[in-house]
Amino acid sequence: MGEEIDLEIAKMTDRIAVVVLKSPSMSDVDAIAAASGKIQQFVRENQPQTLIFDFEAVKFFSSLVLGLLLDIRAKMTAYQGEVLISAINPQLHRVFRITNLDRIFRFFPDRESAVEAASSD
């Protein structure tokens, strides 16, 4: 059996939730699929206006994580929801720039500033 992605999903308000990614490495196909299932279920059941992905602990991820983020974004866009990304390290942020995904996600230096921005939207 492969790695398991440690994550926590917390509702900050009725409109804002945070997915705290606690695993330093996110590359196992089955683990990413399982994490995606948990997050998608949360989105279906709660329909947060804003979902913040906190990458503070993450040092490496495979391209499957980009797919996960795009899938969640597509589901949330259907009801005018938004995905924000916080505390991502510069090397991982570079992946978003290279793929032009930095144009569709908003980035914040830390979880607190992302929550603050979402609260003022």
Which sequence ranges carry the predicted segments?
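STAS-typified acidic loop motif
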Residues: 4-37
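Residues that form or immediately flank small-molecule/cofactor binding pockets and catalytic motifs
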Residues: 14, 90, 112
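Amphipathic alpha-helical interaction surfaces in cytosolic regulatory modules
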Residues: 26-104
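Short acidic-hydrophobic, aromatic-tinged amphipathic segments that line or gate anion-handling sites
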Residues: 106-110, 114
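A short, charged, amphipathic alpha-helix used as a generic interaction element across diverse proteins
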Residues: 114, 118-121
